[in-house]
Amino acid sequence: MTLSFITRWRDELPATYTALSPTPLNNARLIWHNTELANTLSIPSSLFKNGAGVWGGETLLPGMSPLAQVYSGHQFGVWAGQLGDGRGILLGEQLLADGTTMDWHLKGAGLTPYSRMGDGRAVLRSTIRESLASEAMHYLGIPTTRALSIVTSDSPVYRETVEPGAMLMRVAPSHLRFGHFEHFYYRREPEKVRQLADFAIRHYWSHLEDDEDKYRLWFNDVVARTASLIAQWQTVGFAHGVMNTDNMSLLGLTLDYGPFGFLDDYEPGFICNHSDHQGRYSFDNQPAVALWNLQRLAQTLSPFVAVDALNEALDSYQQVLLTHYGQRMRQKLGFMTEQKEDNALLNELFSLMARERSDYTRTFRMLSLTEQHSAASPLRDEFIDRAAFDDWFARYRRRLQQDEVSDIERQQLMQSVNPALVLRNWLAQRAIEAAEKGDMTELHRLHEALRNPFSDRADDYVSRPPDWGKRLEVSCSS
C-alpha cells in the first residue's frame, strides 16, 4: 500500500517554518518500532526491513516535504523569545483513509535554524524515555503523541557525558503549540496569529468554520481539552516536569516528554525536573500552571477575540478540571454515585498517604480489592498507623454500601481505572542502561508490558521501586 502525504502546513502557513532535510547519523540502525501503531497507520512492514531508511532520516517517502517549525514561548514563567524545532523536523502529514491526518515528526534529525546553541541531536536515553512514556500514556487512555520508531547510531552526542545519537519518529494529529501563537503575537503580527487560528479551526474544528462565533467556541474547547488533560494527569500521578508554553498542545495532547515522572510515594509537591529549583512544575502545581499557560494563549487572541469572551472561557477552566477530576477519582474509589462526603474521604486518604509516603499506584490498585462487608484488606499492611487506616477504611466501606452495588461490579470498575503498572523512572532507566550496552530485550519487554497497564502481574514491574530507583533525578538534557 502506498502512503499518502499532504503539505497543508507548508502550503497554508508559509511564515511558520524553514524547509530542510534531516541530517543522517553514522551507522544508524532501527532498534524498535511500534507494530500496532504501524498497522493502524497502514505502514507496510517492508519499510522496517531496509535499514534505518526514513526512520533515520536517510530517505524520504514520496510526498514528504520536510520542514522545521518556528515558535516562541514562556519557559519557567519567563518570556524566552524565539524557540522552534531545534532538533526535530516535520517530515510530512500522512493522509489516512478516514480523512484525518497524522504528522510524522523526526526528533534528533540534525541542526535547524532554530537550534540556537544546540547540536540538533537527541540521545538514545531520551528517545527511549519518550517512546516508553508516550505509549504508556496512550494505553492508560490519556491523550498523547505516539512513538513509531527508534534508531540508534555510532554518532557521539555530548551531554553530561558522551552518549549515542538517536532518532525518534513521533506521530500526532498535530504539533500545534501555544507557542506558535505567541511567536507572532510578540512579533506584533496579529494577522498571522489569526491565520494560525483559522488553520486550526479549518482542519481540527471544522464543524465551527462557518460559525460567526467560531473563535470563541474554538477557544472554549481548547480550554476544556486542556482542563481534561490535566485532570487525567493528576489522577494517574503523572508529572510532566516542563510545562512551558511551547510544550502545550493546542489539541490537548501530552507533548514533549522530558524530565517527566510518575509518582512513587504520594508526595503532592513532587518535583521530577532537577532544574526546577522553585517547584513551578511540581505535581500539585500543574493545574495552576496550565491555566497560566491558557492565559498566555488568550492574550495572543485578544486582537481579534473579545476579551470578555476569552475571560469567560478561562473562567470555565476550574469547573471543567474539577468535574473531570472528580469523576475519575470517584471511579478510582469505586463510588457509583456522588455523595457530599466523597471529597472528605478522598482528602483524608490523601493526608494519610502523604504522612506514610504510601505508594500512589499500589494504594489505589490494592484498594480495588476491597470487599464492602469485610474489614480485611491487603492495603492495611502498607500503613504504619494501622488505627488511622482502620478508622478511614471503616468509613470508606460504609460509603461503598450506600451505592448498593456488588463487590464484583465495583471491583471491575476500579481495576479498569486503577493501573497495576505505570512507567516508573527506574523501569525506564533499567531499559536504557541495557540498550546502551546493546541489549534491547528489556526495551521490547517493557513496551509490551505497558500495553496492558490494568492487568495484574507477578513480576517487579508492579513492585515498589528499589532503593536506587526512588526519586531518580531527571534533567532536561536530551
Curated annotation (Swiss-Prot):
User: What Gene Ontology molecular function terms does this protein carry?
Assistant: AMPylase activity; ATP binding; magnesium ion binding
| Binding-site list for ATP | G84, G86, R87, K107, D119, G120, R170, R177, D256
In this protein, the active site sits at D246 (proton acceptor)
Q: Which InterPro entries match?
A: adnlytase_SelO, SelO
Going by the UniProt record, its keywords in alphabetical order are: ATP-binding, Magnesium, Manganese, Metal-binding, Nucleotide-binding, Nucleotidyltransferase, Transferase
Q: Which residues bind Mg(2+)?
A: N247, D256
| PANTHER family, per database record | PROTEIN ADENYLYLTRANSFERASE SELO, MITOCHONDRIAL
Indicate the family of this protein: Belongs to the SELO family.
Entry's HAMAP family? YdiU_SelO
- Name of the featured protein: Protein nucleotidyltransferase YdiU
Gene this chain is encoded by = ydiU
